[in-house]
Curated annotation (Swiss-Prot):
Its main location: cytoplasm. Pfam families: CTP_transf_like (PF01467). One of its GO terms (biological process) is coenzyme A biosynthetic process. Homohexamer. Pathway: Cofactor biosynthesis; coenzyme A biosynthesis; CoA from (R)-pantothenate: step 4/5. GO terms for molecular function: ATP binding; pantetheine-phosphate adenylyltransferase activity. The gene is coaD. ATP binds at residues 9-10, 17, 88-90, 98, 123-129. The record marks 17 as: Transition state stabilizer. Substrate binds at residues 9, 41, 73, 87. This is Phosphopantetheine adenylyltransferase. One of its GO terms (cellular component) is cytoplasm. The lineage of its organism: Bacteria, Bacillati, Bacillota, Clostridia, Lachnospirales.
């Protein structure tokens, strides 16, 4: 059984993330969306909120489950028996960074393969940072995130629509 992991902070989760998740789920038997708990980082959403939002958004995909981890990805992968890392690429700058990380992970565990998926054209510009920037000013984020998350995101900035 091929178990893959799509790791990230997903703060907040976007249509770009969903695009990668849906496409990744077609190439592995089981896909774990691994939500990183980085206590050194100030997240907009708590770990529990991020996990909950991803579960909501991926409920229609039977071979996807959501987990969370802190520390090294390669250590978490051993725990869940995953051998494939899925990474989404938006631009050349993403590739340069992700290639270095993939090589470092391969040194840690040579059985790990990293698969790069280019983002769909509709989402090649999209990031959680962009969502937060627009939301913080009350901008329209309906093209960036699922409808059911919009009010939750605005609420973090004390904004109502």
């Amino acid at each position: 059984m091929k178990v893959g992991i799509y790791p990230g902070s997903f703060d907040p989760v976007t249509f770009g993330h969903l695009d990668i998740i849906e496409r990744s789920a077609k190439i592995v038997d089981e896909l774990v969306v691994g939500v990183l708990n980085n206590s050194a980082k100030n997240s907009l959403f708590s770990l529990e909120e991020r996990v909950s939002m991803i579960k909501e958004m991926t409920a229609h995909i039977p071979n996807v489950r959501v987990g969370c981890f802190e520390g090294l990805l390669v250590d978490y992968m051993k725990k869940i028996n995953a051998t494939i890392i899925i990474r989404g690429l938006r631009a050349v700058t993403d590739f340069e960074y992700e290639l270095q990380i993939a090589q470092a992970n391969g040194v840690q565990n040579p059985e790990i393969e990293t698969v790069f998926l280019t983002s769909s054209l509709n989402y090649s510009y999209l990031s959680s940072t962009i969502v937060k920037e627009f939301a913080s000013y009350g901008g329209d984020i309906s093209k960036f995130v699922p409808e059911q998350f919009i009010d939750r995101i605005y609420a973090k900035y004390n904004i109502t629509r």
